[in-house]
Amino acid sequence: KYLAFAHKADQENKPYAARIFRAAAEAETIHAHAHLRAMGGIGNTEDNLKEAIGGETYEFTDMYPPMMVDAENEGEKSAYRSMNLANEAEKVHAEMFKKALADPAKTPPKVYLCKVCGHIHEENIPDVCPICGSKSHVYIEME
């Protein structure tokens, strides 16, 4: 959330607040990595890919569907759309992790990320995001 807060502060021309929010976001990442290491939660790449597949699969099979039902029942269209887009993106993420697990050392293709919904696409940028319908200009290349 701190990165979203930083973006808003940038929009409001409040650079000090934006910088502090970005620093706090990075600090939280440092904390998460430290906690994960302390719990022995970082295995070898194959184990980490299996963990990632399990996590993404849980999200699109068990986590998001009931949340989407609740949002729909409560008439929260924006919340429903957000969760539905994330749910669809998680399916793609799980498939990508499966592909990486099959050959983790291969030369990676170009990978692009839709900044609207989180869809990941390999090789080239689609004209339109298959999940959210955004135009190609919203994609960024990942290193």
Predicted regions, residues:
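Non-heme di-metal
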Residues: 1-143
